[in-house]
Each structure stands twice: as structure tokens, then as C-alpha cells.
Amino acid sequence: EDFVTSAGAAVGRVDAFNDEYDGTRQDRIRYDTPSFGGFKVSVSHANDDRNDYALRYGGSFSGVKVKGAIGYGQNEANTQRNVTKGSIGVLLPMGLSFQFAAGERDLDAAAGRNDPSMQYYRIGYRFKGSELGETRLAASYHDAEDFSANGDELQIISVAVVQIIEPLGAELYAGYSNLDLETTATANIEDIDIVTVGLRVNF
């Protein structure tokens, strides 16, 4: 999807102003340690001297489930691709959940450039509203800064609902997202609105 101005001029693709630090899809060698007290360490090596390191945790306390991870991605061939990232999620017994994620790219080799960064916040609630199955509600806020240039900021607000249909082994879902971009180089950029509706059936 592309951003455009109110006059219809192209500004750029959404992914030019955002990065969720999902990593690359390359052949790699990876080792995961056994779990110790809920903690696990992962190390991997891929082509072009790419190395990834991660510490993960999963556990529960008095019915409260917690999952978290922190990682560092190192690219010896391109130091501008070194990334630090982390996330944590908490699910309470009554069905309320919270998630937070953040990441930053190291641009040491780029003089005068701010390090691009992102933050993600999400709140959710799940309950058994009918005989069909569990209903899940969620709202999230995503903020990405300085990815294309210093001072650029992309904000994404999303809401979603998922209805589990247990007799069919299916999920009915709907969502809405608003993407708002502010840049130092271009004014009057139009928001992007996305509506998603679908049905997923598990076989």
C-alpha cells in the first residue's frame, strides 16, 4: 500500500516508514538451549555473516501467564542492519491481556541520522460470550519513527474482533486499522484506512 498526498502525489510505500523487525527468511544454522526455569537461549548464523541472539521466557504465576523475549541481530556486512528488539505479553486469569514490543536499528555508519525505532502496545480481552466459542477483542497502537528520514513518524491504530466457532473448527474475524504518516519533506499526506473481514477454517 502507498501513501499519497491530498493532491494524489505518491509519497512512498508503508514499509518504507516502518519495520517490525521480523527478521529475514534465509538459510541458517540455529541452536536452542533446553529450557531452564522458563528461560531459553537461541543463537543462529546465516549467510553474509548474519548472527542472531535471543533470550526467551515463558511461565505462569498464580494463573497469570507471561511470555517475553529480547534479541539482537548482527549483520557484519551491513552495520546499519544491526537491530535490538524485545517484547512481553501477559494474560490474566479473567481474560484480560497486555502486550508491549519495541525495537531500534543501529545507524552508526550514517552520519546525522537518528536511529529508527518502533513501539507497539496492545490490550485484549477474551471471554465465552456464546455457545459458539470464545470471543476475542483487541486494540493496539503502533508508532514508528525516523525510518525513512529524521522526523518521520508513522502511527497505526487498530481494533479487531475474533469469534471462535468451535463446532466448525473455524475463526470469524474482522478488523480496522488507521495509518497516519507525518514527514518533514511532504505535507498533507492522506491517511490509509484498512478494513479486514475473513473466515479461517482449520482442517
Residue ranges of each PLM-predicted region?
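Detector for outer-membrane/organellar transmembrane beta-barrel domains
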Residues: 53-164
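Short secondary-structure boundary/capping elements
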Residues: 22-23, 80, 153, 191
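Flexible, glycine-rich linker and terminal segments associated
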Residues: 134-138, 171, 201-203
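C-terminal closing repeat unit and adjoining cap/tail of repeat-based domains
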Residues: 158-181
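Flexible, solvent-exposed loop segments that connect beta-strands
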Residues: 3-16, 107-113, 147-151, 182-188
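Outer-membrane beta-barrel "beta-signal"
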Residues: 191-203
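Surface-exposed coil loops of outer-membrane beta-barrel proteins
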Residues: 1-49
